[in-house]
């Protein structure tokens, strides 16, 4: 795989995020050249310090929605992975700017066409598949967005759904291949230099779940490293063009999900499948190390 990836350039937006940084790490390990975008200079410095690789090129782009914002970063990129997005925390005061999120995917898709990129992979969310009337979630199910809601999680789910819908519209009109990866809650270690492993919103939920899983209503989990591998498959496997990969490896049975596409990919890539116990163990060990062993250990 690394042989075919040599000198192939990939754009990764949101490269300093929990998922984005793992995608960058995997791409670099496979020989790709990575053009990474971040919003702030401090994030750029941490990304460079983390990987220290001459095949990583970091671009500070505060606003992906601005016209031609990606022109320099996307130049020469065969593939584009659009990760940039955040899961809202309960402490977040302001709502989610849905229009900006839609403008960002429009900017990414239009720039990809303008610079002859061959494919876009979009990090979506299980919530985009969440049709409450469907007996099981699958590639064809969709959440019904509600832009009028003041609830932060509804805004998030609506935003992710409207962004993905817009991406598919543009994929069709621009004749640009698209694959989406839609994970459930994501857990695991962080890799950015000096980043607190508890800083990820998903990891905060995972820690609460570990402390008392019986009280958790979270539908399922997947390891962040497995999510990165699914993005790599989406880049490299052209049979996945036009597909929506629903990703959950630890389904708690709260919401029935058809993850057969994901399972078929992981069956070919056994190293990518990280079980839930390892996710918990690796996260807890990293938290202990980050806090110099002062954190109370939670035994799963």
From Swiss-Prot:
Induction: Expression is strongly induced under conditions of nitrogen starvation. Expression is positively regulated by the cluster-specific transcription factor rua1 that recognizes and binds to the specific 5'-T/G-G/T-C-G-C-A-T-A/T-C/T-C/T-G/A-3' upstream activating sequence found in all promoters of the UA biosynthesis genes. Keywords: NADP, Nucleotide-binding, Oxidoreductase. The keyword Nucleotide-binding applies. It comes from Mycosarcoma maydis (Corn smut fungus). Pathway: Secondary metabolite biosynthesis. Its EC number is 1.-.-.-. Disulfide bonds: none annotated. Pfam families: Epimerase. Fatty acid hydroxylase; part of the gene cluster that mediates the biosynthesis of the glycolipid biosurfactant ustilagic acid (UA). UA is a secreted cellobiose glycolipid that is toxic for many microorganisms and confers biocontrol activity to U.maydis. UA consists of 15,16-dihydroxypalmitic or 2,15,16-trihydroxypalmitic acid, which is O-glycosidically linked to cellobiose at its terminal hydroxyl group. In addition, the cellobiose moiety is acetylated and acylated with a short-chain hydroxy fatty acid. This is Fatty acid hydroxylase uhd1. It is an enzyme of class 1 (oxidoreductase). Belongs to the NAD(P)-dependent epimerase/dehydratase family. Dihydroflavonol-4-reductase subfamily. It comes from the Eukaryota. The active site is at 160 (proton donor). Gene3D superfamilies: NAD(P)-binding Rossmann-like Domain. GO terms for molecular function: nucleotide binding; oxidoreductase activity, acting on the CH-OH group of donors, NAD or NADP as acceptor. NADP(+) binds at residues 14-20, 39, 63-64, 83-85, 156, 160, 183-186, 199.
């Amino acid at each position: 795989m690394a042989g075919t990836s040599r000198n192939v350039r990939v754009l990764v937006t949101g490269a300093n995020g929990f998922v984005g940084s793992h995608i960058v790490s995997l791409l670099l390990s496979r020989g790709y050249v990575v053009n990474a975008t971040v919003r702030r200079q401090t994030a750029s410095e941490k990304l460079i310090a983390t990987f220290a690789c001459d095949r990583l090129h970091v671009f500070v782009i505060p606003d992906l929605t601005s016209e031609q914002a990606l022109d320099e970063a996307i130049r020469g990129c065969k593939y584009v992975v659009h990760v940039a997005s955040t899961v809202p925390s309960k402490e977040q005061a302001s709502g989610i700017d849905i229009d900006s999120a839609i403008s960002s995917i429009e900017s990414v898709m239009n720039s990809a066409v303008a610079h002859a990129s061959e494919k876009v992979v979009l990090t979506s969310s299980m919530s985009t598949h969440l049709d409450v009337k469907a007996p099981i979630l699958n590639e064809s199910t969709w959440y019904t967005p509600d832009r009028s809601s003041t609830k932060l999680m509804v805004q998030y789910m609506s935003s992710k759904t409207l962004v993905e819908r817009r991406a598919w519209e543009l994929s069709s009109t621009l004749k640009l291949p698209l694959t989406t990866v839609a994970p459930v809650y994501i857990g695991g270690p962080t890799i950015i230099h000096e980043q607190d492993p508890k800083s990820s919103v998903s990891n905060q939920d995972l820690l609460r779940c570990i402390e008392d899983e019986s009280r958790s209503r979270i539908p399922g989990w997947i390891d962040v490293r497995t999510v990165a591998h699914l993005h790599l498959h989406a880049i490299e496997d052209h049979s996945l063009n036009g597909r929506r990969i629903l990703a959950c490896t630890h389904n708690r049975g709260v919401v029935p999900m058809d993850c057969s596409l994901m399972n078929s990919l992981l069956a070919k890539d056994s190293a990518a499948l990280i079980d839930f116990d390892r996710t918990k163990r690796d996260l807890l060990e990293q938290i202990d190390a980050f806090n110099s062993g002062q954190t109370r250990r939670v035994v799963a």
